[in-house]
Amino acid sequence: ELYVWTEGFQPGTMQRARIQLNALEKAFVLLEREKVRRIGVTLSFGTVERCLDLVTDAFDAHRFHTHRIVVLLRGQLDRLRSPYRVRGCIDWLRSQQIPVGYRLGAPRASMEMRAIDLVQPDFAKLLAPTSKRPEFWEDVLLEARAAGLRAERVIVAGIETPEQRALAVEAGFGFAQGSAIRPAYDPPSIRTPPTLPAHDAPQAATDDTRT
């Protein structure tokens, strides 16, 4: 997953959209240059709603690599003016064989039913519970199942300790993220090194080389 965040300031809606669109473009560059085999990117509901054409154009421009990317949606439905635009984008992505997931912002799936109904995610991600009680972790996963999410396709994020990892395994989560699973790392560089002229290559005459 290509994860992007800001430090020191809170981006506005359009700033966030530009950041996410740039991240989407970088993800495709990483795929094109074979820096990664598969990659996931996050798009907010607001970005999809306001920049729908730019989002679909990005996928159209890299159609030979769309089968290697997954999209994770997030956001608040209450702020959407046109939910049908988001739903239309989801349907379009799936028509391109692109899996679409949803990141839960609330601690329990029961608090996100409207968003889950809208996205109908192929997979979902939620933050690890703060409780150390195994029963609480099991209840969180049971709620996710009751909401229509498949346990083997629920990612629990924020696993920072071996104890949390053990609780996630015991509860039955399919996947997990966090430093206790694999520490975050910088994405591969996509900068192209400058090309140096060959020693035998002829050079254009300058004031210093003219005779």
Task: Identify the meaning behind each predicted range.
Residues 30-35, 61-63, 83-89, 136-138:
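A broad, low-specificity signal for short, low-complexity segments enriched in glycine/proline
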Residues 1-64:
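Bacterial c-di-GMP phosphodiesterase EAL domain
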Residues 39-56, 60-80, 85, 92-93, ...:
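Active-site beta->alpha loop and helix N-cap motifs at the rims of alpha/beta catalytic domains
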Residues 33-38, 52-54, 84-85, 203-211:
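Intrinsically disordered, low-complexity terminal regulatory regions
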Residues 5, 74-79, 103-211:
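EAL-family c-di-GMP phosphodiesterase catalytic domain
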Residues 11-15, 80-84, 133-135:
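Short, flexible/disordered intra-domain loops and linkers
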